[in-house]
């Protein structure tokens, strides 16, 4: 079944450190945002290759369950002679339940912290320096029991895949803006630069797949419960190295706040 749960925390504050009359000379602020979500669900992507599409295109006469209350699988289809009409006939509900598309869970965690300082020595002239830090981590677990739907769609042993990823980046931004008027002419000028860094040594990915599990249920489907001496596949690598530097400027003008 599909499920989605989300939890977020957001905190913002701003403090005036130096004030002269109606002029806020030095201001400090921070933004903190944390989110955590968990999701599980069926395959929905790919217009012609997802569980909803397969159910819509399935033979409506094929039962979902057999007389014992179990899912209508290969032996039932073969006994009833369905393969005489189409060798690819299958039960789309059984296909969904007996695969990682219907047995999966993803967890995501995100933390963003921003601190900034604004200095306004004279009215309209504002310098703003900002530093931000962002961290993300996620995990995924998908389980497929042993099954046989058709002669070509089958899995001889159960299987579980787990992966985890983590990473972080930081960014520095500096801007200088000046807002002023000359009679009925209004100007707003801004220049700035930004630098963002993420990459090697700042994140990593790890994934492993194992089969022949001790238990044939979702709750205990973990790599460590495999009877095999080692995972069928395993890989891990760092995130790619990348950085972005930008310089920008902007001029806004209006006449008498009309044009």
Predicted regions and their residues:
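C-terminal, structured domain-capping segment
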Residues: 7, 110-111
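Surface-exposed loop/interface segments of Gram-negative outer-membrane beta-barrel transport/assembly proteins
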Residues: 14-110, 128-246
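An active-site-proximal structural segment forming one wall of the substrate-binding cleft
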Residues: 125
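Short, intrinsically disordered, charge-balanced linker/junction segments flanking boundaries
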Residues: 249, 254-259
């Amino acid at each position: 079944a599909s499920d989605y749960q989300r939890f977020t925390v957001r905190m913002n504050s701003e403090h005036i450190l130096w004030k002269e009359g109606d002029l806020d000379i030095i201001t400090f602020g921070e933004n903190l945002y944390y989110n955590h979500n968990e999701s599980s669900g069926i395959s929905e992507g790919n217009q012609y290759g997802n569980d909803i599409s397969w159910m819509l295109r399935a033979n409506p006469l094929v039962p979902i369950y057999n007389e014992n209350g179990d899912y209508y699988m290969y032996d039932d289809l073969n006994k009833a002679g369905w393969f005489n009409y189409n060798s690819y006939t299958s039960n789309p509900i059984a296909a969904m339940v007996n695969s990682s598309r219907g047995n999966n869970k993803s967890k995501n965690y995100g933390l963003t912290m921003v601190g900034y300082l604004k200095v306004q020595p004279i009215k309209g002239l504002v310098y703003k320096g900002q530093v931000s830090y962002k961290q993300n981590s996620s995990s995924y677990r998908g389980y497929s029991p042993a099954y046989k739907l058709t002669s070509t769609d089958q899995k001889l042993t159960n299987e579980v895949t787990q992966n985890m990823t983590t990473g972080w980046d930081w960014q520095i931004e500096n801007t200088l803006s000046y807002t002023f008027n000359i009679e009925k002419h209004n100007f707003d000028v801004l220049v700035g630069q930004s630098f963002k860094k993420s990459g090697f040594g700042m994140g990593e990915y790890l994934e492993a797949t194992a089969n022949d599990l001790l238990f044939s249920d979702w709750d205990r489907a973990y790599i460590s419960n495999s009877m095999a001496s080692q995972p069928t596949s395993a890989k891990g690598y760092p995130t790619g190295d990348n950085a972005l530097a930008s310089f920008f400027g902007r001029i806004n003008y209006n006449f008498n706040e009309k044009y």
